[in-house]
A protein has these predicted regions:
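Short, surface-exposed linear segments at secondary-structure transitions and domain or protein termini
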Residues: 31, 119, 129-135
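A general, composition-driven signal for non-globular sequence regions
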Residues: 14, 122, 128, 139-142
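Predominantly extracellular/luminal regions of secreted and cell-surface proteins
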Residues: 2-40
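Local beta-strand/beta-hairpin segments that build beta-sheet-rich folds
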Residues: 108-124
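Aromatic, loop-rich ligand-recognition surfaces of beta-strand-rich domains
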Residues: 1, 40-111, 130-177
Length: 177
């Protein structure tokens, strides 16, 4: 039986928007930890995580293939890199920003600075340290042509056992309704 359900342009069968990675200030050579893992629907360890070897923050910019969309819900799947990874490597905070201008297109090189672009803060997740989905439904939908995802800190203690990785697995953005 063929599924004849028609979806709005740019919306996936799970109801989330199609997105692509425009830019990231931290990514790794190992595909296990690539920033593109944020949008690949792989929720497993050993291949489905954005792992940033950073002690402070990691940023990436997603877009909607040049379109402006209304975003009402943001979901994050929390998982860490490989079998030996510990949940303390999860990002402790995730802040989401939006832009409706083409200013983020200035971000082209590793040396570019995310704060050279004007962003509007949309929400901040205080992450619960466990594997699985965590969502925020916004009070009002926001217009966005670009979405900035900022991972901040991790749950590790700041002593000799500190592990300098900030990780999460998947980001999904949803329209109203």
């Amino acid at each position: 039986m063929k599924n004849e359900t028609l979806l709005p342009v740019g919306v996936r069968r799970d109801g989330s928007y199609y997105t692509r990675v425009l830019w990231a200030d931290v990514t790794e050579n190992d595909p296990t930890f690539w920033v593109n893992n944020l949008i690949n629907d792989d929720l497993e360890r050993n291949g489905g995580t954005w792992g940033a070897n950073s002690e402070t923050t990691a940023n990436c910019v997603l877009d909607f293939f040049g379109e402006t969309q209304k975003v009402k819900k943001i979901s994050v799947y929390k998982n860490v890199g490989i079998t030996i990874s510990i949940l303390e490597e999860l990002a402790k905070y995730i802040t989401v920003y939006s832009s409706v201008t083409d200013e983020p297109l200035k971000l082209r090189r590793k040396e570019d600075r995310i704060d050279d672009v004007e962003w509007t803060e949309v929400c901040r997740f205080d992450i619960v340290m466990e594997e699985g989905w965590q969502s925020i439904v916004l009070p009002e939908a926001v217009d966005a042509k670009y979405i900035r995802v900022e991972l901040k800190e991790n749950f590790c203690r700041h002593d000799e056992s500190f592990i300098p990785w900030i990780e999460t697995s998947e980001i999904k953005l949803y329209p109203e309704g």
